[in-house]
Amino acid sequence: MKYMRHFLDFYHHKNTSEIMLLVFCAAVPGICTEIYYFGFGVLFQILLSVFFSVSFEFLVKRLRKQTVKSLFSDNSAAVTGVLIGISLPSLSPWWLSFFGAFFSIVIAKQIYGGLGNNIFNPAMTGYSILLVSFPILMTNWSFQNSSYFNLFDLNNTFSVIFCTDINHYYSLIDEFQMMYKFITQATPLEQIRTHVLDFNNKIDNIFEFVNYNYYFKNWKWISINISFLIGGIVLLGFNVICWRIPVSILFSLYVFFALDYYFFKKSMYYPIMQLFFGSTMFSVFFIATDPVTTSITKIGRIVFGCIVGFLIWLIRSFGNYPDAIAFSILLSNSIVPLIDHYTQPRVYGYVKKK
């Protein structure tokens, strides 16, 4: 007799360590692209976040008198650190990685019982707390005009990240920008939103600004998103993630902004822009697809993705956080039990009454 695989078994036929390793490998194209544009600070942030995440995981397991063997066998803490490091601006001070790892591992993961028991995505929990607590530090991204890096650049990056005095930190940032022609800026969505909210701008000037930013000025963000899209396709190819979540998020996000742009004329952004700016592709493929914090049913995952897409549109259009992805995912995580309750498949062996 031929047996069919269950939906959940199909996407969990690999062990946790293999899944985490594939997630890291799939993120490599995006990481390399960020290093190309943002400098070696990206690598520092990832290494720091991994170190702090693994350290906090080790300490909590020791305090709870649990075996630390799983710490090095499932690699979940290390991957959480990688995701936090990718989310942080490249020249962020080292203590942002420290606090991000603390809130992600200790608060969002271990307090709920560890791997497999957390309600909210750990990496996005830590990131969201940092974003609310330190909005200026978390929204300054430094592009380097030159793609050539040498040891002197590495040393200066190190001195900025590990600076202990916040005033000296900002002075080093200014000096670093002048010396290496760095451009410190907010993300494109934040820039455009600020320009739109400037009521002194006429509507034609706003559209001109949006078009210029989309086609010419911020192609670097587009290439970063494309790199993470490639990594997401790799994860889909190896059946590490389910296609229903990323497809439903991207589809619903595009539909809501297309309606807003073409029919209601309320949005100043091209709908396709929403898919390739900010952390959209990174979050859609590497954050929202976390199997622990998403729905376990086929229909539920589609519903979950559509809710995430709707919340992204809602917050980007009417909220104060233009990227909005972290908050959208966390809010959607909170209603996953409700989604699962109403999307449960029919029990095996149950015969529908005629």
Swiss-Prot record:
Part of a membrane-bound complex that couples electron transfer with translocation of ions across the membrane. The gene is rnfD. The complex is composed of six subunits: RnfA, RnfB, RnfC, RnfD, RnfE and RnfG. It holds the Pfam family NQR2_RnfD_RnfE. It is found in: Cell inner membrane. This is Ion-translocating oxidoreductase complex subunit D. Its cofactor is FMN. The modification FMN phosphoryl threonine is found at residue 187. The lineage of its organism: Bacteria, Pseudomonadati, Pseudomonadota, Gammaproteobacteria, Enterobacterales. The chain crosses the membrane at residues 19-39, 40-60, 77-99, 119-139, 221-241, 245-265, 268-288, 295-315, 319-339.
